[in-house]
Amino acid sequence: MAIFLSAITAPTWAQFTGQGAQVATPTVAEILAKPVDGQMVRVQGHLLSKIKSETYTFSDGTGEIVMEIDDDDFPKQPVSEKTKIEVVGEVDTGLRRPPEIEAESVRVLP
């Protein structure tokens, strides 16, 4: 009986494998040129400035894009314009504005 219960309650680590499961690694210039609303992306670069609460200008050296980063997703260590970071987030397009990235996770790179 104990073996049966442990088999039922054992954790599983299944992953979604359908459309959109992979995280793309385009440059900011590529995102700006051909934005795909809802596309998950991974970018590396620097925050250049804070525009307003939870809104920043980000650059990877190929271009600049507005990035929304919730305070809860911000790294614990201080981040300046010299700190290299990696952001995984979702491209958000709008009718009357350039594309943005809504960050899901942010980490400081060595």
Please provide the spans of the model-predicted regions:
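OB-fold and OB-like single-stranded nucleic-acid-recognition modules
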Residues: 10-110
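Bacterial N-terminal signal peptides
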Residues: 1-8
